Amino acid sequence: MLRSADIDFNKVISNKPISKDKNFLAYSTKNNKGTCRLGVSIPKSKIKNATERNKLKRVIRHQFLELESSAIDIVIVYRGTANKYDAKLISSSLQFHKKNIIKTTE
């Protein structure tokens, strides 16, 4: 299970983004916890409905489950240009970010 309760967003975001596109910004740093911690930021101004925000958070968490055993902190920031109902576009965007995070943290 990916943990997010004790991640320090400011520490991770203080670095440059690992990857970015029109949908998301992805930040990551190595940690000494031995497990992956994932933080997700979806501004209320971008997606008003809480149910839709939570659906998107579940999709993001699901995409990063395979990194669970990695010792990295990841923060994903939604930029608000993706159509929230276009699952294929969101999924391909998250795959792109995951690939870049894996490449830079090895």
Regions found by a protein language model. Name each.
Residues 1-106:
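Positively charged, solvent-exposed patches that mediate nucleic-acid binding
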